Amino acid sequence: MEKVGQKIRIIDMDGEPNYAGREGVITHIDDMGHLHGTWGGLAVVPEADSYEFIKE
């Protein structure tokens, strides 16, 4: 379960190859469940994108 404050690494973002490998912290989860954070301007869509949690 995703939570604000967790750190993730994007493995694959549908249609956005430049986002692969980016890391960041989840700062907001919207009503649709999309993850917003410090990795850039686009939201991660859990149903379409691949990512992993980074343990600190």
Name each model-derived stretch.
Residues 3-56:
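Basic/aromatic-rich interaction segments and small domains that mediate binding to polyanionic partners
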